[in-house]
Design a protein with these regions (language model features):
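A short beta-strand motif characteristic of beta-propeller blades
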Residues: 2-6
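Conserved beta-propeller blade repeats
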Residues: 8-25, 59-62, 68-71, 123-125, ...
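A flexible loop/linker signature enriched in serine peptidases of the S9 family
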Residues: 9, 26-35, 116, 141
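Short acidic/polar mixed-charge low-complexity motifs
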Residues: 11, 31, 47-49, 78-80, ...
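An N-terminal hydrophobic leader/cap segment in hydrolases
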Residues: 27-73
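Cap/lid segment of the alpha/beta-hydrolase catalytic domain
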Residues: 55-181, 186-188, 215, 220-230
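Active-site-proximal cap/loop segments of hydrolase catalytic domains
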Residues: 139-334
């Protein structure tokens, strides 16, 4: 028998089942994550129950400041459909001058075969509550749109993911949702690679931020940890037969083409994308006189864990984008 269970709005993940009961992680759009107990051991006509067992703490953010995602479908490479979540600026205490469109931050997710989730992401809300629009791009290769879409990225990493991030920004500018003159892109890990490729091989963005991102595919193939040591064979091409492809798609080998300011944020204990990825790219860009910032964090690996590190990195990135894009910021209150 089946017992229907009324579920709250949001995503469910991390399912664990036993004895007619199910534990799931509940990920709503405007509230902290929670653990739900779903109990279906009831008479069929009564239905089941969903009980919240624990949640990730109180939300220290005014609900009125939470931007809700809009599902966006836009033309990607070669006319195929691509997907994203668009978050407009949201802060009831502030309004843009009449006729002014918001600056845009393009977010390129990691994986690279991960996905953009509509679940509450406080890093996205950090930007939208400060007057930025954010588009979280589910570029070709992202999970959640079927096998064919997922496999588009095979042998095409550094191409289709980049093209879709560029296309998302252009689309939002073309339909009048964002300011075409104030476009930035950011990403971490594989998303940092997509970010650096977008800045190197396209001239659309005015600034970028690479969080422990890849600059040199050849070095990544040599240096990364064992678990992902053959991952690039599928994403880029067989190693070492495709070495010229690796070099052609590595921002470090084409640093002369990158012409906008970039901020790099790196954990010094990172074993997945070692610090030399950021350090060699920073040196190459500084050698050509570009505006570059580099923040290295002791005791941080691949993905920052310490609250102080995350806060420092976000505030530095925000200040960097504001300077580059010519956005005035209010002085801190006493």
């Amino acid at each position: 028998t089946e017992a229907p269970i009324d579920l709250p709005e949001g995503e469910l993940a991390g399912v664990s089942c036993a004895d007619g009961r199910v534990l799931v992680q509940h990920l709503p759009e405007a509230a902290p994550a929670a653990i739900l107990l779903l109990d279906a051991i009831l008479p069929l006509d009564e239905g089941g129950t969903a009980t919240s067992l624990a949640h990730a703490g109180e939300l220290a953010l005014d609900p009125a400041c939470i931007a809700r995602p809009e599902h966006l479908v836009f033309p990607g490479e070669d006319g195929r459909q691509a997907f994203a979540l668009y978050y407009p600026p949201c802060n009831p205490d502030f309004a843009a001058p009449p006729g002014e469109l918001p600056p845009l931050v393009v977010r390129s997710h990691g994986g690279p075969t991960g996905r953009a989730s509509p679940a509450l992401n406080l890093q996205i809300q950090f930007w939208t509550s400060r007057g930025f629009a954010v588009v979280d791009v589910d570029y070709a290769g992202s999970t959640g749109y079927g096998r064919a879409y997922r496999q588009l990225l095979d042998r095409s990493w550094g191409l289709l993911d980049v093209a879709d991030c560029v296309a998302a920004a252009r689309h939002l500018a073309a339909i009048g949702r964002v300011d075409a003159a104030r476009l930035a892109i950011r990403g971490g890990s594989a998303g940092g690679y997509t970010t650096l490729c977008a800045l190197t091989f396209h001239d659309l963005f005015k600034a970028g931020a690479s969080w422990y991102g890849v600059a040199d595919l050849e070095a990544l193939q040599r240096d990364t940890h064992k678990f992902e040591s053959r991952y690039l064979d599928r994403l880029v091409g067989p190693w070492p037969d495709a070495i010229e492809v690796y070099r052609a798609r590595s921002p470090l080998h084409h640093a002369e083409r990158l012409s906008c300011p970039v901020i790099f944020l790196q954990g010094l204990d990172d074993r997945v994308v070692p610090p030399n990825q950021a350090e060699t790219m920073v040196a190459a860009l500084r050698a050509k006189g570009l505006t570059v910032e580099y923040l290295a964090f002791e005791g941080e690996g691949h993905g920052f864990r310490k609250a102080a590190t995350i806060e420092t990195a976000l505030l530095a990135e925000h200040a960097f984008f504001c300077r580059v894009l010519g956005i005035a910021t209010a002085p801190p209150e006493d």
